[in-house]
């Protein structure tokens, strides 16, 4: 093999979802840099990888970059894997790749399982356009800004089971979404419905595993500023506070909450 460094996609759940090429490379390289050696060791034992494993995660990636460059300079071959999917895509790897590119080290990437495409391929969609966010920020304001930015595009993101309900509560309850979990595993599940329906379902059912969410694109029926002001005035007359008005209007029309607040206090 002429290349010295390999980015290798690994299964996202089902251990059989690995390519023959990936197995061949992981059996051949001298070292495998892993997000978590314990996770990769399970794969190594199943397929007989004999390479030495060492950790390379978001907390030591800069330090490990130096080690990997040193190994390559010594003529060794190194593969980078994450716990699931492709390194550098919502996983550690981008810092290392930058360092390798700056050193003009040849990189070969091996494609494989991907949670986003596995999820999207099973969904009915009005259009093919989508924006992949990665892990959505925990901050509610940042979430609102992202959802407002992509309100006319199918917006796809990862979320943890512990935060899913809280994140969904920050989206208009009548917005159509899809939620996938445990993809490629025995208990794989995909639910499609309104935010309200999905919240009610997962309040009654166990929520485990990695989560992928798609917020369906809104129809492009923009509301004029005058109409927004009219709705705002109605709520003012009903005695709602500026904060509550901003929240209600932004969820009804998918508008940025800060934009609505500015209209409220004009």
Where are these regions (language model features)?
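Glycine-rich, flexible N-terminal cofactor/catalytic loop recognition
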Residues: 1-58
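A contiguous loop/helix-start segment that scaffolds small-molecule binding in enzyme catalytic cores
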Residues: 2, 77, 154, 158-266
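Short active-site oxyanion
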Residues: 26-32, 104-107, 153-155
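Conserved helicase motor
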Residues: 56-62, 135-139
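Short phosphate-binding loop-to-helix
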Residues: 58-73, 92
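A glycine-rich beta-strand to alpha-helix segment
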Residues: 73-118, 164-168
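Class I SAM-dependent methyltransferase SAM-binding "motif I" and its flanking Rossmann-like core
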Residues: 95-150
